[in-house]
């Protein structure tokens, strides 16, 4: 918006004339200063106002300029008002209005203004160099570290040793649709946007910290939800000898050896269930030991849980008395995908030295190396008595020579759903050597009614005698672990351990006598 043009004529109003004189006098002196600096010349201004008051301006010294003026005798340019008006008329101005300044003159600035603008420009350049590189483009790609369970089973926060082997794969999400900050609301299921979205709840967290199944883990992106849970589209499972078998979410579920829970609707969420009982078996383990009072919750009906978020349960019956500080969620959800004991037999987590090999307990498919499983002493249990290796009975000629087996105590009350002995700390001994059957011995009824459970009878497992009826033929031996269970009460994930008919007349003395007679070669 330019200045208001006024007519160039004498101002009649005294006040306006004084104001105009003051402003334009300073403007004239400013132009003289700029001209003297830019063009390296000497300028002298002598002004007398209407009241004959003198105002002068000199670029250097007025006397020196006036001396030069008086002594100068060469032809020179001399202009008056008439000359200026004539020049303006030639340029197109009528001489009545105040002409617009020339283009070059309008762009000229004083040295002070030039310095100020130069400093401002330098400051802006510094700001752009400092902060300009961090401004993201509209479509940018930001690498995000997402835990992906790709090589082994899932990762759990375990203060005293993890049951499963953690394996994280760093993936880079470069889709601008997922990480673009221009979108105010990101998808909560951004890792698998093609699947239906469901809100995450606390049921999806196993033990409060399921890092690889939930996107609630810390993410480098500060713009909201990156992944509410891991993509249920792909989940690596171990099936037989294949460690990297990937099952798509839309494929049929792998066959299981036990009765599966009825699923009313198919959902694309995967669940890794290693402890499966037809009657809704739940295993509750504390941080340091097995809480026997929690055994009352074994018969909780699965219909009482209505959570729809994916759950991963890794509670195995062979590790109940180990005192491992992990907790398991009740397997009360849709059983679209369940891992059988044969599929879990080759997982590296179940064959680690810190835990009992599930493949040796359930399927007995592959010979395992002799392991040294930890045998902590849970409450109300005694360590197994040392065994004396003796020659094996000749009824089993097809069995190869056995190496030294290592015994792992297993709580009987947690292995039997619906068992009338939830509080009895009787322990079975499970060998981790292949081709060895398990001989289970339930406790006598007198121990159930005792206020304080006595020390349980722990005996080494060996091949039962032909005449002994303590091993159930319906359960099958461990050499045929792939065979379906004849009874619906127990699944093969329980290690095919089942109680035999309770002997009424046998006491602890008879059991301890068998400790010396039952031998293992």
From Swiss-Prot:
Domain notes: The beta domain, missing in a number of isoforms, is required for enhancement of transcriptional activity.
Record's subunit section: Interacts with MYOG. Forms a complex with class II HDACs in undifferentiating cells. On myogenic differentiation, HDACs are released into the cytoplasm allowing MEF2s to interact with other proteins for activation. Interacts with HDAC4 (in undifferentiating cells); the interaction translocates MEF2D to nuclear dots. Forms a heterodimer with MEF2A. Interacts with MAPK7; the interaction phosphorylates but does not activate MEF2D. Interacts with CCAR2 and HDAC3.
GO cellular component labels: chromatin; intracellular membrane-bounded organelle; nucleoplasm; nucleus
Effect of residue 180 to A: Abolishes MAPK7- and EGF-mediated transcriptional activation
Its biological purpose: Transcriptional activator which binds specifically to the MEF2 element, 5'-YTA[AT](4)TAR-3', found in numerous muscle-specific, growth factor- and stress-induced genes. Mediates cellular functions not only in skeletal and cardiac muscle development, but also in neuronal differentiation and survival. Plays diverse roles in the control of cell growth, survival and apoptosis via p38 MAPK signaling in muscle-specific and/or growth factor-related transcription. Plays a critical role in the regulation of neuronal apoptosis.
A GO biological-process term: adult heart development
Region (Beta domain): 286-292
Keywords: Acetylation, Activator, Apoptosis, Developmental protein, Differentiation, DNA-binding, Isopeptide bond, Neurogenesis, Nucleus, Phosphoprotein, Transcription, Transcription regulation, Ubl conjugation
Residue ranges of the region described as Disordered: 174-207, 244-266, 357-407, 437-521
Organism: Homo sapiens (Human)
Similarity remark: Belongs to the MEF2 family.
Record location of the Glycyl lysine isopeptide (Lys-Gly) (interchain with G-Cter in SUMO) cross-link: 439
Name of the featured protein: Myocyte-specific enhancer factor 2D
Transcription listed as a keyword: yes
Keyword rRNA processing on entry: no
């Amino acid at each position: 918006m330019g200045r208001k043009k006024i007519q160039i004529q004498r101002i009649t109003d005294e006040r306006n004339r004084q104001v105009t004189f003051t402003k334009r006098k300073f403007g004239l002196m400013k132009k003289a200063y700029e001209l003297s600096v830019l063009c390296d010349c000497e300028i002298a201004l002598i002004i007398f106002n209407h009241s004959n008051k003198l105002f002068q301006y000199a670029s250097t010294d007025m006397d020196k300029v006036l001396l030069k003026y008086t002594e100068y005798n060469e032809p020179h340019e001399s202009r008056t008002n008439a000359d200026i008006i004539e020049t303006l008329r030639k340029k197109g101005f009528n001489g009545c209005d105040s002409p617009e300044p020339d283009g070059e003159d309008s762009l000229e600035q004083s040295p002070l203004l030039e310095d100020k603008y130069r400093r401002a420009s330098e400051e802006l350049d510094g700001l752009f160099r400092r902060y300009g590189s961090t401004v993201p483009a509209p479509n940018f790609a930001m690498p995000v570290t997402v835990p992906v369970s790709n090589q082994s089973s899932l990762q759990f926060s375990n203060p005293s040793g993890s049951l499963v082997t953690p394996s994280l794969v760093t993936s880079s999400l470069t889709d601008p649709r997922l990480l673009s900050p221009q979108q105010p609301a990101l998808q909560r299921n951004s890792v698998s946007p093609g699947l239906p979205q469901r809100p995450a709840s606390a049921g999806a967290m196993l033990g409060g910290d399921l890092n690889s199944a939930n996107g609630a883990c810390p993410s480098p992106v500060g713009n909201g939800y990156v992944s509410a849970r891991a993509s249920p589209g792909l989940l690596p499972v171990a099936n037989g000898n294949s460690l990297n078998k990937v099952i798509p979410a839309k494929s049929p579920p792998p066959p299981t050896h036990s009765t599966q829970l009825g699923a009313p609707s198919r959902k694309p969420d995967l669940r890794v269930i290693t402890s499966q009982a037809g009657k809704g078996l739940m295993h509750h383990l504390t941080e340091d030991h097995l809480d026997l009072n929690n055994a009352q919750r074994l018969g909780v009906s699965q219909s009482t849980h209505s959570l729809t978020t994916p759950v991963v349960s890794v509670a195995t019956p062979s590790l109940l008395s180990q005192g491992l500080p992990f907790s398991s969620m009740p397997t009360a959800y849709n059983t679209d995908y369940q891992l059988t004991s044969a599929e879990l037999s080759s997982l590296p987590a179940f064959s680690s030295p810190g835990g009992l090999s599930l493949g040796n307990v359930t399927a007995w498919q592959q010979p395992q190396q002799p392991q040294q499983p930890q045998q902590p002493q849970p409450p109300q249990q005694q360590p197994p008595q040392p065994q004396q290796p003796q020659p094996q009975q000749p009824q089993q000629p097809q069995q190869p020579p056995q190496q030294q087996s290592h015994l792992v105590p297993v709580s009987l009350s947690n292995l039997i759903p619906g068992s009338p002995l939830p509080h009895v700390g009787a322990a079975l001994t499970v060998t981790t050597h292949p081709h060895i059957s398990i001989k289970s011995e339930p406790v006598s009824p007198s121990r159930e009614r005792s206020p304080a459970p006595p020390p349980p009878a722990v005996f080494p497992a060996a091949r039962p005698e032909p005449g002994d009826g303590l091993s159930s033929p319906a359960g099958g031996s461990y050499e045929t672990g792939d065979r379906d269970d004849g009874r619906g009460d127990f699944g093969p994930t329980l290690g095919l351990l089942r109680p035999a008919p309770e002997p009424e007349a046998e006491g602890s003395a008879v059991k301890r006598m068998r400790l010396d007679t039952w031998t293992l070669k």
